[in-house]
Curated annotation (Swiss-Prot):
<dbReference type="InterPro" id="IPR050931">
    <property type="entry name" value="Mito_Protein_Transport_Metaxin"/>
</dbReference>
<dbReference type="GO" id="GO:0005737">
    <property type="term" value="C:cytoplasm"/>
</dbReference>
<dbReference type="InterPro" id="IPR040079">
    <property type="entry name" value="Glutathione_S-Trfase"/>
</dbReference>
<protein>
    <recommendedName>
        <fullName>Failed axon connections</fullName>
    </recommendedName>
</protein>
<dbReference type="InterPro" id="IPR036249">
    <property type="entry name" value="Thioredoxin-like_sf"/>
</dbReference>
<dbReference type="Pfam" id="PF17172">
    <property type="entry name" value="GST_N_4"/>
</dbReference>
<dbReference type="GO" id="GO:0007409">
    <property type="term" value="P:axonogenesis"/>
</dbReference>
<feature type="compositionally biased region" description="Low complexity">
    <location>
        <begin position="9"/>
        <end position="19"/>
    </location>
</feature>
<dbReference type="Pfam" id="PF17171">
    <property type="entry name" value="GST_C_6"/>
</dbReference>
<feature type="compositionally biased region" description="Low complexity">
    <location>
        <begin position="28"/>
        <end position="45"/>
    </location>
</feature>
<feature type="compositionally biased region" description="Basic and acidic residues">
    <location>
        <begin position="364"/>
        <end position="418"/>
    </location>
</feature>
<dbReference type="InterPro" id="IPR012336">
    <property type="entry name" value="Thioredoxin-like_fold"/>
</dbReference>
<feature type="region of interest" description="Disordered">
    <location>
        <begin position="1"/>
        <end position="95"/>
    </location>
</feature>
<comment type="function">
    <text>Together with Abl, involved in embryonic axonal development.</text>
</comment>
<feature type="compositionally biased region" description="Basic and acidic residues">
    <location>
        <begin position="46"/>
        <end position="77"/>
    </location>
</feature>
<comment type="similarity">
    <text>Belongs to the FAX family.</text>
</comment>
<feature type="region of interest" description="Disordered">
    <location>
        <begin position="361"/>
        <end position="418"/>
    </location>
</feature>
Length: 418
C-alpha cells in the first residue's frame, strides 16, 4: 500500500498532503535539545543552502536548455495534430451484398422469374407490387437465389448500405421514410378490417397453398414451368436439375411438414385443408363484391397482398389439376377480375417479364445502334486514320525539303571558301 500511494501524485492524495503540513509546525515549535546543537547545525544549514543554490542553478540551466533546444519540438508537437486533422477519414464499411450501390436506390432480392408468374413467392410479389404501385425507384438483384437476409428470408432489400428484411417490415419502413401510405384514405374501421384480412391471407391461405406445393413438388415445376437452369444460373441440363430438385425437396418435405404441423394446418386431412381454402376465398369474394378494389376505386395494402396471394392460384397452368384454383375460377369470378386489374395497373410489362424472364424489365434499356450508325462511325474512324496518315506524310516531305536546302547551302559555303 505504501508503494502504491507513493506513486500517486500529491494532488490526487489530499490526506497525505494535509498530514505533512500538520507535522511541519510541530517540528518548528519544538525547542533544540541543547545549545551546542545550534552551532553544529549552522554549517549544515549553509551546506544545505549551497546545495539548494546549485540545484536552483542546475534547474535554471535546464530550463534555459529547454527554452533553447526544445522549442522546435513543441512546434512539431503542435503541428502534428494539424497533420492528423488533414487526413481523410476512413471509408465507411457497409455490411451488404451490393457494395457499389447508388444512393436512394432500393435493391430488391427475391426469387427468379417464371414463364407464368413474376415470382413464385407471394411475399416477393407483394413487395415488388407495392414498390411499383407507390412509384419508388428500385432494382432487382440477379443473385440466382444465392443470398438470404440476416433472418434467412426472401425477400429483403438493401437501401443506402442498410438491409431491411421481411415483406411487412419493408413496406412499413419505406412507407415511413418516403411518406407513401396506401391506406391514408381509410377510416379506422376499414384499417382494422384490412389488418385482419391481411392476417387471414398471410397466416392461413398462404399456408394452404404451401401445403399443396410441399405435397406435390413435381406440380410446382410443371405448373409454373420453372426453368431451374435459368433460375439457379447453372449449365447442367434441366433433367438432371429436376432430379436433384426432387431429392432435395423430398428432404425438405419433412421439415415442411413439421412447420405445417407447428402452424396447425398440417394436422388436418387434405380434404379439410381444401375446405379451409375455399372458405377463405369465399370471404374475400364477398368482401370485394362488385367494387374494383376492396375499399373502392383505388387499391390499398389489402389489394396488394390479395393480388400477390391469389396470383399464385390463378396463373397456375391449366395442365395441372388444383381444386382450389378451379373453385376460385368458377365460384369467385370477381377475384379473377381483381387480379387482372392489379396486373394491368402494376405490371404493364408482365408479358415481357415472363417471356424474357427479365428481372428489370421496368428499367429503360439503352437503344441498340443501327447498322447505318455503325457504318457511319466506322467511316469516321477510317477518315480520321487517313487524315493522320496524310499529316505524317506531309511532315516527312517537309523534313526532306528542309534537309535538302541545308545540304545545298552547306555546299555553297564550301565552294565559296575554296
Amino acid at each position: 500500500m505504501a508503494s502504491e500511494v507513493a506513486q500517486i501524485p500529491a494532488e490526487e492524495t489530499p490526506a497525505v498532503a494535509a498530514a505533512e503540513k500538520s507535522e511541519e509546525p510541530e517540528k518548528s515549535a519544538a525547542p533544540p535539545a541543547d545549545s551546542a546543537a545550534a552551532p553544529a547545525a549552522a554549517p549544515a544549514v549553509e551546506k544545505a543552502e549551497d546545495a539548494d543554490g546549485e540545484k536552483k542553478d542546475g534547474e535554471a540551466g535546464k530550463q534555459d536548455k529547454q527554452q533553447d533546444g526544445e522549442e522546435p519540438k513543441k512546434d512539431e508537437a503542435v503541428a502534428a495534430p494539424v497533420a492528423t486533422k488533414s487526413e481523410a477519414p476512413p471509408a465507411q464499411k457497409f455490411n451488404v451484398h451490393k457494395t457499389n450501390f447508388e444512393k436512394d436506390i432500393i435493391y430488391l432480392y427475391q426469387f427468379s422469374r417464371t414463364p407464368l408468374l413474376p415470382s413464385l413467392s407471394p411475399y416477393c410479389l407483394k413487395v415488388e407490387t407495392w414498390l411499383r404501385l407507390v412509384g419508388l425507384k428500385y432494382e432487382n438483384v440477379d443473385h440466382k437465389m444465392r443470398f438470404r437476409s440476416k433472418k434467412g428470408q426472401l425477400p429483403f432489400i438493401e437501401l443506402n448500405g442498410e438491409e431491411i428484411a421481411d415483406s411487412a417490415i419493408i413496406i412499413k419502413e419505406l412507407s415511413s421514410k418516403y411518406e407513401k401510405y396506401l391506406d391514408s384514405g381509410l377510416t379506422a374501421e376499414q384499417r382494422n378490417v384490412s389488418y385482419a384480412t391481411i392476417a387471414m391471407l398471410e397466416n392461413h391461405l398462404i399456408w394452404i397453398i404451401f401445403y399443396w406445393r410441399a405435397k406435390y413438388p413435381d406440380n410446382v415445376l410443371k405448373g409454373y414451368k420453372v426453368n431451374l437452369q435459368h433460375a439457379l444460373g447453372l449449365r447442367l441440363p434441366n433433367s438432371i436439375l429436376n432430379f436433384f430438385f426432387k431429392i432435395t425437396f423430398g428432404r425438405k418435405w419433412f421439415q415442411g411438414t413439421k412447420k405445417l404441423k407447428a402452424h396447425g394446418i398440417g394436422v388436418h386431412s387434405a380434404e379439410e385443408i381444401e375446405e379451409f381454402g375455399k372458405d377463405d376465398l369465399k370471404v374475400l369474394s364477398e368482401m370485394l363484391d362488385c367494387k374494383p378494389f376492396f375499399f373502392g376505386d383505388e387499391p390499398t395494402t389489402l389489394d396488394v397482398v390479395a393480388f400477390a396471394v391469389l396470383s399464385q392460384l390463378h396463373y397456375l397452368s391449366k395442365d395441372i389439376a388444383y381444386p382450389l384454383r378451379d373453385y376460385m375460377t368458377e365460384k369467385c369470378p370477381n377475384l379473377i377480375g381483381h387480379v387482372s386489374r392489379m396486373k394491368d395497373k402494376c405490371f404493364p410489362d408482365w408479358d415481357e417479364i415472363c417471356t424474357k424472364l427479365d428481372l428489370n424489365a421496368h428499367i429503360p434499356k439503352p437503344e441498340p445502334e443501327t447498322k447505318e450508325g455503325k457504318e457511319g462511325g466506322e467511316q469516321e474512324k477510317s477518315n480520321e486514320q487517313e487524315g493522320t496518315e496524310g499529316d505524317k506524310i506531309e511532315k516527312e516531305l517537309e523534313k526532306d525539303k528542309s534537309n535538302e536546302k541545308e545540304s545545298t547551302e552547306e555546299n555553297k559555303e564550301k565552294e565559296e571558301t575554296k
